Amino acid sequence: MTITNQQLFERSRQYIPGGVNSPVRAFKSVGGTPVFFQRGQGAYFWDVEGKSYIDYVGSWGPLILGHAHPDVVRAVQIAAGHGTSFGAPTAAELEIAELLCRLLPSLEMVRLVSSGTEAGMSAIRLARGYTGRNRIIKFEGCYHGHDDALLVKAGSGALTFGHPSSAGVPAETAGHTLVLNYNDVAGVEETFSKMGTEIAAVIVEPVAGNMNLIKATSQFLETLRTLCTKHGSLLILDEVMTGFRVGLECAQGLYGIKPDLTILGKVIGGGLPMAAFGGRRDVMECLAPLGSVYQAGTLSGNPVAVAAGLETLHQIQVPGFFDKLSTMTRKLTEGLTAVAAKHSVAFCAQAVGGMFGLYFRKSPPESFAEVMESDREAFNHFFHAMLKEGVYFAPSAFEAGFVSAAHSNEEIDKTLAVADRIFGQGMRRTEKATL
């Protein structure tokens, strides 16, 4: 007898907190039973009940080539056959470090780690060690991993210290983090004018992907660069999501912004656990064993993950790769916007490279507050209706979606046809029409 998603979820909750190993997978935001998957191929994956889905999550971004790309699978098999871990230097980790520095002009040196959280917390420690300062600026709605210093929410005013957004984070730790509004140039200028000499770094997603998808304005990023330079603070671009997902030179290439440090993850591991942080040589040389800022990891530079990452990075350098990816993503977002308008549904969408955001409101949001004004009940209805028809979007109104190189006109057309039927069957139409 075939096991069901519900049966697995009930068993999982006995042994795994909430039944999942990362909270969003529990479907708490949208309700219902999480889907348990057992295999994937290209733009599709299949659950334990044998149902297939067009996948617009892509393991939350890493699978830019799609599921089980044959060249990536082959690279992993070869690497694993030679040994799954050495805890020592390898030629392959040097190769990927050289490649990352060649592809991203802002990287003069790079350190490999195993997760985006690890990269983010290491970059923060490095910035503090380099500058001798403690204060960090982050922006409301941006997510940089579950490091204590970054699980912080805004206080009651622009210059108030942050408060923990998770139990277990000491108030003293959160107090070193200032939380400002995304795309708020005036707020950043005011904060630097009063506290600039105390700020070690500003960390920001150039395209935010954890409050759905919000693009930074050019003025916002240029202001951050100017103020960090003026006050001796480091600008850290969190490109865990956008890195090699929105273009070959990442979001910093699209905006023409050169950060002091960059955080990378997801795509560079090809679907296996790997991330990195890197940047200016004088800053990176503060890391042990050269300097006094300590960072280490047993599985850092894991040879199997490096093999998957190298093959993925080679594939995305093929001429025209990002043109095709962007075209498919825009076809999806523009098509969804058109069918929603056809049925008078308050809806919009936008895309950057292979990332996209869907919003049940009339215009794309520019801040966390505007995201919160979107019609989340309408999103939840849409999510479950699409899921039932075999289209898998992120199970949260606050997460970006992803298109892979394996998505073709066939998958996009199927998705739009399903959305057309669902929008036509009676979504909530005008509640948020003025937003």
From Swiss-Prot:
Listed InterPro entries: 4pyrrol_synth_GluAld_NH2Trfase, Aminotrans_3, Aminotrans_3_PPA_site, PyrdxlP-dep_Trfase, PyrdxlP-dep_Trfase_major, PyrdxlP-dep_Trfase_small
Any one GO molecular-function label of the UniProt entry: pyridoxal phosphate binding
Pathway info: Porphyrin-containing compound metabolism; protoporphyrin-IX biosynthesis; 5-aminolevulinate from L-glutamyl-tRNA(Glu): step 2/2
Enzyme class: isomerase
Primary localization: cytoplasm
CDD domains: OAT_like
GO cellular component, one term: cytoplasm
Pfam families: Aminotran_3
Keyword entries, A-Z: Cytoplasm, Isomerase, Porphyrin biosynthesis, Pyridoxal phosphate
Residues modified to N6-(pyridoxal phosphate)lysine: K266
Catalytic activity: (S)-4-amino-5-oxopentanoate = 5-aminolevulinate
Cellular compartment(s): Cytoplasm
EC numbers for this chain: 5.4.3.8
Cofactor: pyridoxal 5'-phosphate
Annotated GO biological process: protoporphyrinogen IX biosynthetic process
Quaternary structure and partners: Homodimer.
Family: Belongs to the class-III pyridoxal-phosphate-dependent aminotransferase family. HemL subfamily.
NCBIfam families given in the database record: hemL (TIGR00713), PRK00062.1 (NF000818)
Protein name: Glutamate-1-semialdehyde 2,1-aminomutase
Species, as recorded: Nitrosomonas europaea (strain ATCC 19718 / CIP 103999 / KCTC 2705 / NBRC 14298)
